Curated annotation (Swiss-Prot):
It comes from the Bacteria. This is Ferrochelatase. Keywords: Cytoplasm, Heme biosynthesis, Iron, Lyase, Metal-binding, Porphyrin biosynthesis. Belongs to the ferrochelatase family. Pfam families: Ferrochelatase. The keyword Kinase does not apply. Pathway: Porphyrin-containing compound metabolism; protoheme biosynthesis; protoheme from protoporphyrin-IX: step 1/1. Catalyzes the ferrous insertion into protoporphyrin IX. HAMAP family: Ferrochelatase (MF_00323).
Length: 391
């Protein structure tokens, strides 16, 4: 029997306060997160942003106990998935590969090779594909394949996105139903989906399918929820966690909460749709920041649906995904990294603002001038970024 390695890919998170700065640096040093015309600017800019944001982020992590629970939860998901797959007759071993903190992807790959695995199923713990999540993780795995001959020879099957998988949809609907039933008038409870946002340019310019997959997923979950409850609930969708002055996909979570309060909503059932594990966005942003906002807006009951974590229906759904991947047509890593015709991965292609090499040279000079202006404002404490509250 072939030995199967199941590689669970996730974001990662700082486990201690002193990890916050390095964790943020790793995020902003990723060209899938911040795209620059000159690669030489990536690490200096990542250092600046992580330095500026560390204090605020450290406060958020202190509010949830001093660190992220993401690694602990993901490793528990891996253990339970491994156990279930073995019960189903699959000789599987699960591995955790975090993108921006320990255990890094390199560590998981080293363990896979040391264990003599025969083939690998790559399962991103992001139900909805985005350039900045699954895309970045696939690209990192590609990079390791290119530099490691023994790993390159290992057969790999990839699961790209699974927002419409019946097991995932059912698990979400079951957890939502539990909270809806607690409402004073369950049929009137407002089901409010909050997804992590992405810059609007990702969707409109790069062709990122994330927003379409989120919207389609919401529709599927609401249909399943109605099957479970026997009645339909009003629902809405918004996007959270935006940073910086760039426009992100809308509507924004904070604005919709205020609108719902003004409209007289009493019972709000909040669904963290793009998060399969509890972490900073659910425990701090939703549970603390947005709960307070909802109270101020006049919403009486704020019930947050727990993240899937190791919910049995969810783990069964993950096992079904792995089984289907092993039985179905192979989707290799290169195919997984080319989800749509317009999706661009960076630095896979050069980020061109000009029509010729002279234009690109000027682009780089302009970027350097902008970077110098940013440094000057950082040192002086005055400028447009301070005026808009970014610094």
């Amino acid at each position: 029997m072939a030995r199967v390695g199941v590689l669970l890919m996730n974001l990662g998170g700082p486990e201690r306060i002193q990890d916050v700065g390095p964790f943020l640096f790793n995020i902003f040093a990723d060209p899938e997160i911040i795209r620059l015309p000159n690669p030489a600017l990536q690490r200096p800019l990542a250092w600046l942003i992580s330095t500026l944001r560390s204090s605020k982020s450290e406060q958020a992590y202190r509010s949830i106990g001093g660190g992220s629970p993401l690694r602990r939860i993901t490793e528990q998901q891996a253990r339970e998935l491994q156990s279930l797959l073995r019960q189903r007759g699959i000789d599987a071993t699960s591995y955790v590969a975090m993108r921006y903190w320990h255990p890094f992807t390199e560590s998981a790959v080293a363990d896979i090779k040391a264990d003599g695995i025969d083939q690998v199923v790559v399962l991103p713990l992001y139900p909805h594909f985005s350039i900045s999540t699954s895309g970045s993780s696939f690209r990192e795995l590609q990079r390791l394949r290119q530099t490691d001959e023994s790993f390159r020879k290992l057969p790999i099957r990839c699961i790209r996105s699974w927002y419409d998988h019946p097991g995932y949809v059912l698990a979400m609907a079951e957890l939502i139903a539990e909270q809806v039933r607690l409402s004073d008038v369950p049929e009137e409870a407002q089901v409010f989906f909050s997804a992590h946002g992405v810059p609007k340019s990702y969707v409109e310019q790069a062709g990122d399918p994330y927003q379409k997959e989120i919207e389609a997923c919401t529709t599927l979950i609401m249909a399943e929820l109605e099957n479970l409850l026997g009645y339909g609930n009003p629902h809405s969708l918004a996007y959270q966690s935006r940073v910086g002055p760039e426009e992100w996909i809308q509507p924004y979570t904070d604005e919709v909460i205020e609108q719902l309060g003004e409209a007289g909503t009493r019972d709000l059932v909040v669904v963290p749709i793009s998060f399969v594990s509890e972490h900073i966005e659910t425990l701090a942003e939703l549970d603390i920041e947005y709960r307070e906002l909802a109270t101020e807006a006049g919403i009486v009951h704020f019930r947050r649906v727990p993240a899937l974590d190791t919910y049995p229906t969810f783990i069964e759904g993950l096992a079904d995904l792995v089984g289907s991947s092993l039985e179905g047509p192979e989707i290799n890593l290169d195919e997984a990294a080319k989800l749509a015709g317009r999706v661009k991965f960076y630095p896979q292609e050069r980020w061109q603002w000009g029509l010729n090499t002279s234009s690109e040279a000027w682009n780089g000079r302009i970027a350097m001038l902008g970077f110098a202006a940013f440094l000057l404002e950082l040192i002086s404490g005055h400028g447009p970024l301070h005026a808009i509250g970014l610094l």
